[in-house]
Every structure is written in structure tokens, then in C-alpha cells.
Amino acid sequence: MSRLSANEAAQLLGVSVPTLYAYVSRGLLHSRADGASKRRYYDADEVRLLARRRADAKRAGNVAERTLDWGVPVLESRITQIADGKLSYRGRDAIALATAATLEEAAALLWECPLARVQAAPFVAQSFDAARWRGWLDLWRDRPPLERALALLPATAPAALSETARSVPSIADAAPFDAARGLPARDADADADADADADADFRRRDARLDEAATLLRLATAALAASTPSAEPVHRQLAAAWRVNDPRDVGLLRIALVLCADHELNPSTFTVRCIASTGAPLFGAIAGGLAALSGPRHGGETLRVAALLDGAARARDLDRYVAAQIASYALEPDARTRLPGFGHPLYPGGDPRATLLIDALIDALAARSAASPALDGTLALAEAVQAALGEKPTIDFALAALERTLALPAGAAFTLFAAGRVAGWIAHALEQRADGKLIRPRARYVGVDHAA
């Protein structure tokens, strides 16, 4: 734990030392005695959290409007941070993580559990009815990924998750993972009741992790029109899409990790609202998928694909871009000047897009492969940046990946959704642990009821 003196804490908060002491007396901050002296010290993380809360309060203004419009945070989370143009998962640089990690490793970080728990999925590995799944899949194989997932998840998840509940590991198996999971430590001197409670805690935690790992695989298989597998998600998608080059398979891995979470976006807020009601986890994930489908969220990749198609047919790229800018300027959301460009949270450019596009360029250069599709994609990005000063977002990068690798239509959306399921699960688990019902209020602006 990093420690601060009273002067250091006051400076970080931008207040006087007497005001700092007032915060302590009001319970907003805690001080701790230094055993070597009479001085008190402060936990740096706690001070920084209070500083962020004060900053949020100062800029709250008309909270009812701004909290729902890229404004003041509406709830607290320890999962993902977006600040100063950087994206972090539980304090780790998500961009650096994506260069080497699998989605399962990112999920283990987001879910705060050992990697082995994410990889386990006992239902998929031991008792999954593949023939029954294929029968359902045949009915939906020709439908878009989202429709297929929304149909198959409710049909298969309840049976799968009841099976995981019967296969929860024993307390003896779970005990070595106490620290990694952040579970309450076992007290050797605890009485029998406390021991039984701890055992129940472990079992509930294990059941939730089995449920989460199973849902990750069911969602992936439904989106990709494949059979659920314990293989890493990027390899499952590569097999479904017949991607064989190891460099290209690596690009799928990078994309999934970059999409794993992005703080409190519309789909994640939907997931948290559903989870707060006590609904089943698969219900929260299904709600997230429905929200993700919107053209201003995960469905943005489909609009980018249409933009790329038009650019490929255009005789004059600059005139095409100007016409598209004029067309999108008529949309209700003035920020949506062109799909796939300019992210409000990244004024200097979306780092996720930068990494994925650079990795795509490097993968093709490594095998000296010419790609008219990539050349056209990069030309469009340059033309838009020249016209608007806007840089590509992750939606554009995913569409570029789909187009360059000749993946099936909708693959960009599938990558976005399959990766984001890991983050949704993390948020659902965090919301369940919080135990509060999310119930915002609306400010009525209609006609008053006549007296």
C-alpha cells in the first residue's frame, strides 16, 4: 500500500490540511497511525478515489442530463479505467496486454480469478450435447450472428448452467486459490458455522465462475455458428472462419482482448441493470447483446463496412468522403460525422484502433502480401483524417480486419461481441456483489396534471 503524509494527501486533493482532517472526521477518508511516530498517514489509493469523486461533483452541473451523455460517472467500478487517452483493465494497460494475452487471460484478470477457472468450463468439456446443439444451430446458421446468439443462448444456457451447478469443485480444490480470487481467508480457529459459511462462499464463487466460463463459450459458438469448445476463443473463431496463418490467428486474439471491456458503455450499463435485478447471468448477457446491436454501438462496424464498400466503388475518394460527411451531418447525434472515426473518450485517437491496424499492417508485411483491400481501407482513413481531423476507432479497425482477411460478413461484429462478453460478465459479477438495484430517476418535463 502506497502511503501519503497529511501534506501530500492535502496537496493531491487540492485542499488545506485542516480540511483534510475534516474529511477524516466526516468519514470520507481514513488515517492510520505510523507505528514509528505519532504521525498519521493516508492510503494513496483512497485519497485518489476521493479526489476523483470531488472532481466529478464539481463538474456535475445538470447531472440528470450529463450522466447519460458522456458525462459524470453514475456508479463506481474497479474493472476498467479510461483516462488521459489510455485504457486499463484492473490497473493494467489493456493495449500492452493485447499484444500477448488471450481473451481467457484477459477474462481471468477482469473476473479476478485464476486462468484455470476460465479455461475449465466443465459443462462444455464433459457433458455437452453436441448433437442437440447442432440441431438448433442448423435452424439459425444462415441468420446474422446477433440473431443466432439471441436465439441460442436462452435455449441452451439454462440447461448448461444447471449442469455446472452440479459440478462445482469441492472446498479442498478451491482453497489454494484464496488470494488470487480475493475470497475471505479461512480462519483456522473459526467455529464450525464459520467454516460452513466459508465452504458455501467458495462453492458459490466456483459456481459463478463455471457459469461465466460456460457462457463465454456458448456465446462464442452461437456468434460464430460453431460447436462450443474449451479451445481458446480466438482459435475457435479461426477454425470457424478457416483462418490458418498463425499471424492472422494472432490478429483475432488481439482484437478480442481489445474489445473485452470499455467501461460503462450502453451495453455494459444494460448488463449491470439486468444483473442488479437478480436475473440469471445469461439474461444479462442476452440484454448486452441486444444493446450492442444498435448502429451507434457494436452495430457501428456494419456502418463502417458500408462506408468501405462505397469507398471501394468511388472514382473520387475525396468527393465521396465529402458527400458522406454531408449525409451523416443530418443525423440527430451531431458527433456521428462518419461511422468509425472520432471517439469522444480519445481526443488524440483510439489506442485500440492504432494497435490493431498497426498489427494488421505488420502481419501482411511479414509475408510480403499485397492487399488492395487494406490499401483502400488506409486510403479512406487518410482521406477522412484530412477532411475532419478524426482518427479511426476500434469499429473501423475491426471492419478493416474483416475486409483485409476476407472474413465472413459480420465477423467484425462477432469479434466485438465475443470479446465484450468477458467484460459484461465481470460487470455482472461486480454488480451482484454490490447487491444494489440500479433504479435511476427521470426528471419529468411534460404537462403537469391538472388540479
Label each region the model flagged.
Residues 2-189, 197-451:
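Hydrophobic alpha-helical bundle cores within soluble ligand-binding/oligomerization subdomains
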